[in-house]
């Protein structure tokens, strides 16, 4: 086999493979482009901003279909204060909109990033599961003060990916019309 034939064959293979590689890269780009961005404001919780940002980071590194960041036109706001028995909580529609209340007393007692990531989970559509182990982010304070896991587990990640697959798909409601 001549060098010329070998070179021509290599170029031919490269020409055939390049569209596949380009197609694969394009699919990754379009998948990433399909991610919904939820804009957040931390201006109401300046004392805890670093923990909120870290909690958002836990979600951003765990899921692809939704990303959270500080930007203009925030639909999700964080505020700090003393909320008594209610403690830290989220008032949200579960679609990336609402207000997350960060409680001073809970932040002094529990893992700060876990609290912010947990409450953000509500804003993304997850419910509490207080009976769950520390490995479940949505077990919240039920896992105790020694729990420092601030990352969603596989089931929580899958739920968010499913819910946010096309932006956020509202829960299906069925009715029978007569």
Label each region the model flagged.
Residues 1-27:
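Secretory targeting and sorting signals
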Residues 29, 77-101:
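Catalytic zinc-binding patch centered on the HExxH motif and its immediate surroundings
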Residues 32-44, 95-102, 140-141:
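Acidic/histidine-rich, surface-exposed loop or edge segments in extracytoplasmic proteins
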Residues 39-68:
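A short alpha-helix/helix-coil micro-patch that ends at or immediately precedes a cysteine
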Residues 59, 114-128:
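Active-site recognition of the HExxH zinc-binding catalytic motif
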Residues 63-73, 127-133, 171-175:
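Surface-exposed patches in mature extracellular/periplasmic domains of secreted proteins
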Residues 100-117:
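Short pre-active-site segment immediately N-terminal to the catalytic Zn-binding motif
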Residues 110, 123-169:
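The catalytic-center signature of Zn2+-dependent metalloproteases
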């Amino acid at each position: 086999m001549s060098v010329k034939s070998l070179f021509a064959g290599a170029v031919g293979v490269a020409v055939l493979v390049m569209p596949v590689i380009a197609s694969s890269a394009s699919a990754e780009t379009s998948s990433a482009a399909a991610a919904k961005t939820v804009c957040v404001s931390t201006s109401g919780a300046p004392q805890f901003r670093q923990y909120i940002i870290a909690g958002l980071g836990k979600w951003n590194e765990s899921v692809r279909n939704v990303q959270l960041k500080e930007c203009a036109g925030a639909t999700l706001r964080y505020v700090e204060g003393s909320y008594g028995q209610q403690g830290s909580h989220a008032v949200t529609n579960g679609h990336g909109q609402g207000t997350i209340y960060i409680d001073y007393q809970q932040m002094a007692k529990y893992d700060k990033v876990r609290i912010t990531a947990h409450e953000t989970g509500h804003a993304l559509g997850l419910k509490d599961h207080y009976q769950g182990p520390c490995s479940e982010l949505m077990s919240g304070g039920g896992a105790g003060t020694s729990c420092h896991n601030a990352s969603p587990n596989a089931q929580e990640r899958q739920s968010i990916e499913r819910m946010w697959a096309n932006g956020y798909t509202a829960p299906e409601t069925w009715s029978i019309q007569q």
